[in-house]
């Protein structure tokens, strides 16, 4: 129990998919919690000189509970993991369970803004959009450029955000 019952990416990546289909109210509560702590995620992004929102790697109350260390702090894929789980839940249940669409739109827009500010078009790569200095799910291969999982999930996050955009998107 090294994580002491805290929320972290495993919640959305491994636990939430099961509950989405077997106990939707439980999955909904996980995702609503992420909506509830969005202001803290916005504060965290600002602390790291990023736009939008960056959810904490590990939390119990919306604040980052892990000590700062580069490999952990660079696990930005947490944002995409949350949006991917949220999208899966909404695709499965639509509006049947009353998820607040304004919160959905804001979560999507703010996490998309984080990716836009984290990545950059790099001239020596042919001006491809790169997301550098990140740590993917393999915590033992830390601080790399263009981690495949991170880049794939960032793309998913951006595409979901466009598809679910509303008044919050710009």
What role is predicted for each listed range?
Residues 10-11, 23, 27, 104, ...:
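Hydrophobic (often cysteine-bearing) scaffold residues that line and stabilize catalytic clefts
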Residues 13, 20, 35, 59-61, ...:
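Short, flexible loop/turn elements at secondary-structure junctions
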Residues 13-25, 81-96, 114, 118, ...:
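Well-ordered alpha-helical scaffold segments within catalytic/enzyme domains
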């Amino acid at each position: 129990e090294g994580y002491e019952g805290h929320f972290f990416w495993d919640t959305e990546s491994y636990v939430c998919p099961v509950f989405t289909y077997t106990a939707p109210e439980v999955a909904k509560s996980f995702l609503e919690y992420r909506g509830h702590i969005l202001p803290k995620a916005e504060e965290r992004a600002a602390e790291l000189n990023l736009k939008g929102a960056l959810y904490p790697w590990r939390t119990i109350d919306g604040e980052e509970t892990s000590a700062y260390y580069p490999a952990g702090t660079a696990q930005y894929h947490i944002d995409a993991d949350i949006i991917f789980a949220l999208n899966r839940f909404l695709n499965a249940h639509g509006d049947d369970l009353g998820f607040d669409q304004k919160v959905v739109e804001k979560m999507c827009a703010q996490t998309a803004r984080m990716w836009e500010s984290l990545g950059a078009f790099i001239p020596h790569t042919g001006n491809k959009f790169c997301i550098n200095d990140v740590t993917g799910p393999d915590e033992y291969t830390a601080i790399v450029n263009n981690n495949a999982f991170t880049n794939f999930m960032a793309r998913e996050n951006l595409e979901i955000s466009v598809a679910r955009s509303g008044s919050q998107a710009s």
